[in-house]
């Protein structure tokens, strides 16, 4: 039986590594004054009239939505409705960012324009975030098992135990990160996630804490593949996640491990 959530052509490496996907994208401003519980943001959505999963993305400590805007547009162009948010203050801590990601999902479903609301399948939601936004992503995933996917990017959180998470989670770390070093953040976060869930750990080679703030082929490719696989239940994308990218010398990926198959 055909998957009703499949969107777009059969995927290839070239399609996933390109700066934009197959869908034309429109955008809509979410005013800080109209946003309840977060600092406003920008919604990117496919122009094609259909229903799509929805994704909320938080920036990191001291960051604004501009630091993750490229991800909003990139992911929307593959068939998702995406909001990149400003936080209430740029100094908000991870657990505050979790609440704001949740508020942003609610905003898209209930308060955005009809063009946005009519395109969202509210049963298929996901969250992403950079740095403290990645910590917020983990926190919300631990609180909302109904989420379909979570992607923390070079995440930072004081809590190291995420064994309560039941959401398919892709953690992306960076080997040269000195702000949230993988040895004390991304790796122990991944290791603490239960082996019973679909999870993966991708460590970028030669990359710093701020790798998610500029267009990155690897982050874009594997974030889209993860969202497609778990928000859209689209098994055409499993080929990119299992066995996943090769790691080692002279590659763009330092390490990749997962609970494949999924």
UniProtKB/Swiss-Prot annotation:
According to the lineage, what is the superkingdom? Bacteria
The annotated active site, in chain numbering, is 131 (nucleophile), 177 (charge relay system), 209 (charge relay system)
Does the entry feature the keyword Hydrolase, yes or no?
yes
The family this protein is said to belong to? Belongs to the AB hydrolase superfamily.
Enzyme Commission designation: 3.1.1.74, 3.1.1.101
For poly(ethylene terephthalate), which residues are the binding ones? Answer: 61, 132, 156
Query: What GO terms are given for molecular function?
Result: cutinase activity
Q: According to the UniProt record, what happens if one changes residue 65 to E?
A: Decreases activity on poly(ethylene terephthalate)
- GO cellular component terms, semicolon-separated: extracellular region; periplasmic space
- Role description: Catalyzes the hydrolysis of cutin, a polyester that forms the structure of plant cuticle. Shows esterase activity towards p-nitrophenol-linked aliphatic esters (pNP-aliphatic esters). Capable of degrading the plastic poly(ethylene terephthalate) (PET), the most abundant polyester plastic in the world. Capable of degrading the bioplastic poly(lactic acid) (PLLA).
Reaction(s) the record says it catalyses: a butanoate ester + H2O = an aliphatic alcohol + butanoate + H(+); an acetyl ester + H2O = an aliphatic alcohol + acetate + H(+); (ethylene terephthalate)(n) + H2O = (ethylene terephthalate)(n-1) + 4-[(2-hydroxyethoxy)carbonyl]benzoate + H(+); cutin + H2O = cutin monomers
Q: Where is the signal peptide?
A: none
Q: What is this protein called?
A: Cutinase 2
């Amino acid at each position: 039986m055909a998957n009703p959530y499949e969107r777009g052509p059969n995927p290839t490496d070239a399609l996933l590594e390109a700066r934009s996907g197959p869908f034309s994208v429109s955008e809509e401003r979410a005013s800080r004054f109209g946003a309840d519980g977060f600092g406003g943001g920008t919604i990117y959505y496919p122009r094609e009239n259909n229903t799509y999963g929805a994704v909320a993305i938080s920036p990191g400590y001291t960051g604004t939505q501009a630091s993750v805007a490229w991800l909003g547009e990139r992911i929307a162009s593959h068939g998702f409705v995406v909001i990149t948010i400003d936080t209430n203050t740029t100094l908000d801590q991870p657990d505050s960012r979790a609440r704001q990601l949740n508020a942003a999902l609610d905003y898209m479903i209930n308060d955005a324009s009809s063009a946005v609301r009519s395109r969202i399948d509210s049963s298929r939601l996901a969250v992403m975030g950079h740095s403290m936004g990645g910590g917020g992503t983990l926190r919300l995933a631990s609180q909302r098992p109904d989420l379909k996917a979570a992607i923390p990017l070079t995440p930072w959180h004081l809590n190291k135990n995420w064994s309560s998470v039941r959401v398919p989670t892709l953690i992306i770390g960076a080997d040269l990160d000195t702000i949230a070093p993988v040895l004390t953040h991304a790796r122990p976060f991944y290791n603490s996630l239960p082996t019973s869930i679909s999870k993966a750990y991708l460590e970028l080679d030669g990359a710093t804490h701020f790798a998610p703030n500029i267009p990155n082929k690897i982050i874009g490719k594997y974030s889209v593949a993860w969202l497609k696989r778990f928000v859209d239940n689209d098994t055409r994308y499993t080929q990119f996640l299992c066995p996943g990218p090769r790691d080692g010398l002279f590659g763009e990926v330092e390490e990749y491990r997962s609970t494949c198959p999924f």
